[in-house]
Design a protein with these regions (language model features):
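A short, hydrophobic beta-strand/beta-hairpin element that forms part of a small beta-sheet core
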Residues: 253-264
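Short, low-complexity, disordered segments immediately C-terminal to signal peptides
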Residues: 22-38
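Non-globular targeting/processing and membrane-anchoring segments
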Residues: 33-186
Length: 285
């Protein structure tokens, strides 16, 4: 499967607006103090399309004022979900997440029991909301919660497998290249597998996402075998790496938490250290 850089970027949909605002892990969370007075905002989708199946759906969103993503927002966003007939099927609520990222986000989570097209509405939004699609599992090409994660021989320190550089995190490669994904899955240990390119990410979230996972790696040690695969095979970002095609991905970053070869949790596009630690702790519980 061949995916061009343009196709990879396009797969993230409206996530391109985020890139222009330059999320950077070195920024302080102090720049994103909640502003409870924000109203009339547009919902900026920070989730991929065509990847959701019935069950628990995570919808990370940011908020914007016309064309500008806001660096402040309410401490909590509340709202509801409508089905294709505009019937309300769920209420939702999510706290702001802004630890060491410039643009805060709210990870909305809702349980959807059947495929369909839905609309997320939030109190104080501009009246339009944000659409999302839940598909029959047979129509989803990427691994999802409950499906197996296929093994793949990802680049390691000892064998880059044609990916140069094998890790674009700076100032030095991340420590998550000691074993391949195949070896990690075969070990029987819980596995965390992240695909993302810190150097060429178009959403501005890949470098902080990987840095947060490295910190989690230091915290939990060998309780989880962690593996990273970069997105491009070359430093010019002209050729998509085989690891991306192996999963059928058209967006990044993505983190899979896996037990006994089965995906237990999948986190898409954006997370901060707080949310990541919460999800890893739940994964290990």
């Amino acid at each position: 499967m061949s995916i061009s850089r343009r196709h990879l970027i396009a797969g993230a949909g409206t996530l391109l607006v985020v890139a222009a605002c330059g999320d950077n892990s070195k920024s302080s969370s102090q720049s994103t103090e909640p502003d409870p007075g924000t109203t009339g905002f547009t919902i900026a989708q920070r989730y991929p399309s065509n990847t959701f199946v019935p069950g628990k759906v995570r919808l990370p969103i940011s908020i914007s004022n016309k064309q500008t993503l806001l660096t402040t927002g309410p401490a909590v966003l509340n709202g509801y979900v409508l089905d294709s007939t505009d019937k309300q099927i769920a209420t939702v609520s999510a706290p702001i997440h802004s630890t060491d990222i410039v643009i805060p986000y709210w990870p909305i989570v809702v349980n959807i029991d059947q495929p369909g097209t839905f609309t997320l509405r939030l109190d104080g939004d501009d009246g339009f909301g944000a659409a999302f699609l839940v598909s029959d599992p047979s129509q989803v090409t990427v691994p999802y919660v409950g499906s197996p994660l296929p093994p793949f021989d990802t680049p390691t320190v000892d064998n880059h497998r044609g990916v140069e550089p094998y890790c674009t995190l700076t100032p030095k490669p991340c420590p998550l290249h000691e074993v391949t994904l195949t070896q990690a899955l075969g070990s029987g240990a819980p596995v965390a597998y992240i695909v993302g390119t810190p150097a060429h990410c178009q959403t501005g979230t890949c470098a902080p996402a990987l840095e947060f996972l490295v910190k989690s790696h230091s915290r939990v040690g060998d309780k989880i075998t962690m593996v990273h695969a970069d997105v491009y095979s070359d430093d010019a970002a002209t050729t998509v790496a085989p690891a991306v095609a192996a999963l059928g991905l058209d967006y990044e970053p993505v983190l899979y938490l896996v037990k006994h070869g089965t995906v237990v949790d999948r986190v898409d596009v954006i997370w901060d250290q707080q949310e990541l630690d919460e999800r890893i702790d739940a994964f290990l519980a």
